[in-house]
């Protein structure tokens, strides 16, 4: 029992209570001893003292039990407080976990939206690049067609110009050759005759 009291921290209160009870018992014994000096009452006094001592022991045991019960009640209260603190800590931890999960869900949603926006921007850029590529190709085709048409027109003009120059040169050569042939065909006498006929015609006109 003493070990149980010591283990639960009740030994000092129990010893203090026992000391008080023994002090009271000693005081009572002294009072009985001083008041009962006659031999006839010695046997009764011894029985009374023995009975009183048992009462004191019972009282001490009862007091110890009471002290132990009070201490245990305090221990239960402390345990209850500790349990409440543990429950509070667990509740706060659960709330913190819930808040963290909520934050994680929010950030995950924001990250997903950001990824979708990035994908959309990338798709728009790629589409814009394809449209720009098609536009450049179309402009290049138009430019090439214009250059081809311009080259064709220029070539046609050059051909026509060359043909005209060839015709002019051919005509000039033809005239020159005709004159040369005519000169060679007309003789000196024919020239004199032609001049004489021409002069006669002029005179007749006057």
UniProtKB/Swiss-Prot annotation:
Q: Name one GO molecular function term.
A: proton-transporting ATP synthase activity, rotational mechanism
Name the InterPro entries on file.
ATP_synth_b/b'su_bac/chlpt
What Pfam families does this protein's entry cite? Answer: ATP-synt_B (PF00430)
Cytoplasm recorded as keyword? no
Question: Does the UniProt entry include the keyword Transport?
Answer: yes
**Main function:** F(1)F(0) ATP synthase produces ATP from ADP in the presence of a proton or sodium gradient. F-type ATPases consist of two structural domains, F(1) containing the extramembraneous catalytic core and F(0) containing the membrane proton channel, linked together by a central stalk and a peripheral stalk. During catalysis, ATP synthesis in the catalytic domain of F(1) is coupled via a rotary mechanism of the central stalk subunits to proton translocation.
Q: Record's family?
A: Belongs to the ATPase B chain family.
Q: How does it assemble?
A: F-type ATPases have 2 components, F(1) - the catalytic core - and F(0) - the membrane proton channel. F(1) has five subunits: alpha(3), beta(3), gamma(1), delta(1), epsilon(1). F(0) has three main subunits: a(1), b(2) and c(10-14). The alpha and beta chains form an alternating ring which encloses part of the gamma chain. F(1) is attached to F(0) by a central stalk formed by the gamma and epsilon chains, while a peripheral stalk is formed by the delta and b chains.
Annotated protein name in UniProt: ATP synthase subunit b
Which organism is this entry from?
Geobacter sulfurreducens (strain ATCC 51573 / DSM 12127 / PCA)
């Amino acid at each position: 029992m003493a070990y149980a009291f010591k283990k639960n921290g009740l030994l000092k209160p129990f010893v203090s209570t026992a000391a008080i009870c023994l002090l009271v018992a000693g005081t009572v014994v002294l009072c009985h001893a001083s008041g009962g000096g006659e031999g006839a009452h010695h046997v009764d006094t011894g029985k009374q003292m023995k009975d009183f001592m048992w009462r004191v022991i019972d009282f001490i045991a009862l007091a110890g039990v009471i002290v132990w019960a009070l201490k245990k009640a305090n221990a239960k209260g402390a345990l209850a407080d500790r349990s409440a603190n543990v429950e509070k800590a667990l509740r706060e931890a659960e709330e913190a976990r819930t808040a963290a999960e909520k934050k994680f869900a929010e950030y995950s949603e924001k990250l997903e939206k950001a990824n979708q926006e990035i994908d959309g921007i990338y798709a728009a850029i790629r589409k814009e690049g394809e449209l720009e590529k098609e536009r450049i190709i179309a402009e290049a085709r138009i430019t090439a067609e214009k250059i081809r048409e311009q080259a064709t027109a220029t070539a046609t003009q050059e051909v026509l110009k060359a043909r005209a120059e060839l015709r002019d040169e051919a005509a000039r050569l033809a005239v020159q050759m005709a004159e040369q042939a005519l000169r060679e065909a007309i003789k000196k006498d024919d020239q004199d005759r032609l001049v004489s006929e021409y002069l006669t015609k002029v005179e007749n006109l006057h």
